[in-house]
A protein has these predicted regions:
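Short amphipathic alpha-helix that is part of the acyltransferase structural core
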Residues: 2-41, 237-273
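Active-site rim helix/loop that mediates acceptor-substrate recognition in acyltransferases
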Residues: 33-68, 73, 262-292
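Acyl-donor-binding surface of acyltransferase catalytic domains
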Residues: 44-248, 378-381
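Conserved beta-strand-loop-alpha-helix junction that forms the acyl-donor binding cleft
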Residues: 201-207, 347-362, 371, 380-387
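Conserved active-site alpha-helix within GNAT-family acetyltransferase domains
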Residues: 208-222, 341-342, 354-374
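A conserved beta-strand-loop-helix scaffold within acyl/acetyltransferase catalytic domains
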Residues: 271-319
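Conserved glycine-rich acetyl-CoA-binding loop
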Residues: 313-328, 345, 357-359
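A conserved short alpha-helix in the GNAT/GCN5 acetyltransferase fold that borders
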Residues: 321, 330-338
Length: 389
């Protein structure tokens, strides 16, 4: 393969800690770096680490390290070497994806495609204003995303990191289903789909790629783009953020404590499990010790840095709102919790997601200087549909 050859078929790289996987990570980050900020969700996810034996990186680029070529009809490929290749024609689409089914029911896939940063000029739909060449570009992009979905379908499904919780939920659900006279209607379980191994959660999916998944008809019936709330993606230049404001009297800083994980999960529309929260940098605001005997109580505001380093699970208790605590905790978390992700010569950016319609959070992000860059989605892909493509 010469330096002028286009990207080839998808290859699968293991990300379990090793010298070879570090070389792959370094190469992937080099490819993604010029595409920041659009590539930042995947870029930061790879920086964060927290890889398991079933953590994989998929790409059709030659990253210069041994990899497994993907056979669309088999779950295991044969080993193959590859040679460095860092020059790709603009019209040849490429993607890099992080996939780990161990993390279900939480996000299993982050992906960046070259078309997200530089899409073909015209619509993929045939029309007099859409030249054949552009339609062929979109078809190549669709084919590449379809190949990724098929590759995900053919992965083994490991035991979930949260299997004990999923099993307990299933037992509770079975008991409720057999109760002849339930006294109350149990709340819907947002992670019920996680017990179905063919349903896979893709996160922070750029609106352009979300449209491709919809066009391929691989989204679960309950996770269509048209019926799923999109998210604003806000970007922050951390060095330009003002210093965090001083806390009001009677409050003090701390980290989120494990004993408060259940409270935090109950306040979020996207619950995160204890093992994940324990691995994330966090910041919380507590009643000060000795403050009218309330010291040691639960936090009144909190936020985490997520696996893709976005500010996540940001919450201020209702009785404490209107005092700027959300802005204060976000600013302090960005300035102190992101230190290990900074690199020489790379702009120090942080980001956060706000669901469309949440005007309060959107206003807070804008007041901090956040730039609304693009829309993204969390979507469930039905891997059984991959056979129909």
């Amino acid at each position: 393969m010469s330096s002028e050859d286009p990207p080839g078929k998808l290859h699968r790289h293991h990300l379990a800690p090793s010298d070879s996987s570090q070389a792959i990570l370094d190469a992937a980050l080099r490819v993604l770096r010029p595409h920041i900020p659009t590539s930042i969700p995947l870029y930061r996810r790879l920086q964060f680490g927290r890889f398991f034996p079933d953590s994989f990186l998929f790409t059709n680029l030659d990253l210069g390290a041994p990899s497994l070529p993907i056979d669309a009809h088999a779950s295991n490929g044969t080993g193959a070497g590859s040679r460095p290749n860092s020059h790709y024609r603009h019209e040849d689409p490429w993607l890099i994806a992080f996939v780990d089914r161990t993390c279900r029911p939480e996000t299993e896939v982050w992906v960046f495609g070259s078309w997200e940063d530089s899409p073909p000029a015209s619509s993929p739909s045939p029309s007099p204003s859409s030249p054949t060449e552009t339609q062929e570009e979109w078809q190549a992009i669709d084919n590449l995303v379809a190949e990724l979905v098929r590759a995900c379908r053919n992965l083994p499904v490991p035991r979930s990191l949260h299997q004990d919780i999923l099993d307990a939920q299933q037992t509770q659900q079975q008991a409720a289903d057999t109760d002849p006279a339930p006294s109350t209607n149990p709340p819907p379980n947002p992670f019920a789909a996680a017990r179905v191994p063919t349903i896979q959660l893709w996160g922070a999916i750029h609106s352009t790629t979300a449209t491709i998944l919809e066009r391929l008809d691989v989204l679960a019936s309950t996770s269509q783009v048209t019926s799923t709330a999109a998210n604003h993606t806000f970007m922050f230049d951390v060095p330009s953020l003002p210093p965090p404001s001083a806390l009001p009297d009677g409050l003090e800083w701390g980290e989120v404590k494990r004993e408060h994980f259940a409270l935090i999960r109950s306040k979020s529309e996207i619950p995160r499990w204890d093992r994940t929260m324990a691995s994330l940098p966090s910041l919380a605001i507590y009643p000060a010790a000795g403050n009218c005997g309330s010291g040691g109580g639960p936090p009144v505001a909190w936020a985490f840095i997520g696996l893709d380093t976005s500010v996540t699970t940001l919450h201020v208790e209702p009785e404490w709102r209107g005092r700027g605590l959300g802005k204060t905790v976000t600013t302090k978390l960005f300035k102190q919790g992101m230190q290990r992700f900074w690199e020489d010569g790379v702009q120090r950016l942080a980001h956060g997601y706000v669901v469309l319609g949440n005007k309060a959070s959107e206003g807070m992000m804008r007041s901090l200087g956040g730039r609304d860059m693009w829309k993204c989605y969390w979507l469930r892909v039905d891997l059984e549909k991959a056979g129909n493509m």
